[in-house]
From Swiss-Prot:
Annotated protein name in UniProt: Acetone monooxygenase (methyl acetate-forming)
Similarity remark: Belongs to the FAD-binding monooxygenase family.
Keywords: FAD, Flavoprotein, Monooxygenase, NADP, Oxidoreductase
Any one GO MF annotation of this record: NADP binding
Superkingdom classification of source: Bacteria
Subunit note: Homotetramer.
Induction description: Induced by propane, 2-propanol and acetone.
Cofactor binding description: Binds 1 FAD per subunit.
Cofactors required: FAD
Enzyme class, first EC level, given as a word: oxidoreductase
InterPro entries: FAD-binding_Monooxygenases (IPR050775), FAD/NAD-bd_sf (IPR036188), Flavin_mOase-like (IPR020946)
Function as written in the Swiss-Prot or TrEMBL entry: Plays an important role in the metabolism of acetone derived from propane oxidation. Catalyzes the oxidation of acetone to methyl acetate. Exhibits high catalytic efficiency towards various linear and cyclic ketones, such as butanone, 2-pentanone, 2-heptanone, 2-octanone, 2-nonanone, 2-decanone, cyclobutanone, cyclopentanone and cyclohexanone. Elicits the highest catalytic efficiency towards butanone and cyclobutanone. Is highly specific for NADPH and cannot use NADH.
């Protein structure tokens, strides 16, 4: 057993963790990043299932603090796949010489704050300890998979795998009867990718999804030169748009004629991206009539691609509004269900009750015999990555207990009662969901780095949100969230996919630009809402 003494310990080596490590090292801190994976990449290390890829355009899903780093990598597609994304993050780690300060295959199991010394003690799964002044969590929004959901999973005689724990060696689907549980963004990517490779595919659907077609052209030298020439423009604009994408809301619904609205929807739909969702009309999140009109537009597009009226009933949503769930991009996903070897099984009213040795059993007693079960069942979003670590703050309080009652943060950057623990990709910030993740994670990691710089420059050693500061942010967050139609819908956006999880809109819905302004204003006002000592 060993003890390592640091100024700062970073948990995670994905987009946020790599950048945080780089920035704190540039300050001259003794800092190290830890990851239970055997490679860097975070989300893009773990999620190597068939079809995994960006749905942010590749050229905006990049770091914008270093022009040479940005231009030193050339993407092959508008929306590249997992293997290329993982290679890019390894390129970043190598270009910034980060590996010498990274410990892989090192799982942090506990973190305890010592009030007498104002330092954190982290313990690894191997029993080693890390003593650090600052604990920075870069664990990812979607990194705690919902795996053990059904009785009998261990009894299954075939292969059962969660998409976020996909084996590196892959799975041979030839001649196999395969079941996919879940049809969210991940499930859709898997389903459309493996349908032609399996003998039989059954998709177990609880909630139909609005899905938009992806247009994913390859990038040659001209396209690469085009996006690289836009580095300065993207650096200036992305932090200020509503979702951190290059497109933004521009027109109010009421200012356009019905014909103009339709034309705008058609143009955004034809863009082949998330533009229809994140840049057509902001009113889809607040006005039920606008939400219904845009939802019907998407339903119309989906109906036109589905031959069978029964498939329309199974696959097209009717009881919630477009955009209030995570909107997936797809490539011929709907057409997959026209294949003779693919069956959609609706389990909303006839749910899965258990996994048997030979397959999946439903409430009515039906057993679907399978050789492979793929669980595209999502994550304990925002909170699970931290509550699965035994994190203890002041007075022995635990984060798991605190968040089991009420999910609260201060700007998604800290939690009252946990001094010097700074967080990324946790609730009550845009990085919880409604954001191009690199835009939001860069904002948060830069704020954290600057806060630590400020403490050191002023001779302070501790930063902690005040109870009043946290309450003010929670109230502001909830006021915006309660006016948003996302709050009226059941999805992981409000934590309803996790039994017993307190309901709260996880993502800050005031916009990326507004969030950035709020965090910078707090810092400029002497870290208003935080106590420094």
């Amino acid at each position: 057993m060993s003890t390592t003494t640091l100024d700062a310990a970073v948990i995670g080596t994905g987009v946020a963790g790599l950048y945080e490590l780089h920035m704190l090292r540039e300050q001259g801190l003794e800092v190290r990043a830890y990851d239970k994976a055997s490679g860097v990449g975070g989300t893009w290390y773990w999620n190597r299932y068939p079809g995994a890829r960006f749905d942010s355009e590749a050229y905006i899903y990049q770091y914008l603090f270093d022009e040479d780093l940005y231009k030193g990598w050339s993407w092959s597609q508008r929306f590249p796949g997992q293997e290329e994304i993982e290679r890019w993050l390894n390129y970043v780690a190598d270009s910034l010489d980060l590996r010498r300060d990274i410990s892989l295959e090192t799982e942090i199991t506990s973190a305890v704050f010592d009030e007498d010394r104002n330092r954190w003690t982290l313990t690894t799964a191997d029993g080693d300890t890390i003593d650090a002044q600052f604990l920075i969590t870069c664990c990812g929004m979607l990194s705690a998979p919902m795996k053990d959901l059904f009785p009998g999973q261990s009894d299954f005689g075939g292969q059962l795998v969660h998409t976020a724990r996909w084996p590196k060696e892959g799975i041979d689907f030839a001649g196999k009867r395969v079941g996919v549980i879940g049809n969210g963004a991940t499930g859709i990517q898997v389903i459309q990718s493996i349908a032609a490779d399996v003998d039989e595919l059954k998709v177990f659907i609880r909630t139909p999804q609005y899905a938009l077609p992806m247009k994913n052209p390859s990038y040659g030298p001209d396209e690469v030169a085009w996006y690289k020439s836009r580095f300065g423009e993207l650096k200036d604009t992305l932090p200020h748009t509503f979702t951190g994408f290059e497109y933004d809301f521009t027109d109010a619904w009421e200012d356009l004629t019905p014909e103009q609205r339709r034309a705008r929807l058609e143009d955004d739909y034809e863009n082949g991206s998330l533009k229809l969702w994140l840049a057509s009309f902001a009113e889809i999140f607040s006005d039920e009539q606008v939400s219904e009109e845009v939802s019907e537009f998407v339903r119309e597009k989906m109906r036109a691609r589905l031959v069978d009226p029964e498939l329309c009933d199974l696959l097209i949503p009717s009881d919630y509004g477009f955009g209030t769930h995570r909107v997936p991009l797809e490539t011929n996903y709907l057409e997959v269900y026209h294949r003779d070897n693919v069956t959609a099984v609706l389990v909303r009213d006839n749910p899965i009750t258990r996994i048997r040795e030979n397959g999946i059993e439903l409430a009515d007693g039906t057993v679907h015999e399978l050789d492979v079960i793929i669980m595209a069942t999502g994550f304990d979003a925002g909170t699970g990555a931290l509550t699965r670590i035994d994190i203890r703050g002041r007075d022995g309080r635990t984060l798991a207990d605190d968040w089991s009652r009420d999910i609260r943060t201060t700007m998604g950057l800290m939690v009252h009662g946990y001094p010097n623990m700074l967080t990324t990709a946790v609730p009550l910030a845009p990085s919880a969901a409604l954001c191009n993740m690199t835009t939001c994670l860069q904002q948060q990691t830069e704020w954290i780095s600057e806060a630590i710089r400020h403490l050191r420059a002023t001779g302070k050693t501790v930063i902690e949100p005040t109870a009043e500061g946290e309450e003010a942010w929670v109230a502001h967050h909830d006021e915006l969230a309660d006016a948003n139609l996302i709050s009226k819908t059941n999805s992981w956006y409000v934590g309803s996919n996790v039994p017993g999880k307190p309901r709260r809109v996880l993502s800050y819905v005031g916009g990326v630009g507004a969030y950035r302004d709020a965090t910078l204003e707090a810092a400029a006002a002497g870290y208003k809402g935080f106590a420094l000592s």
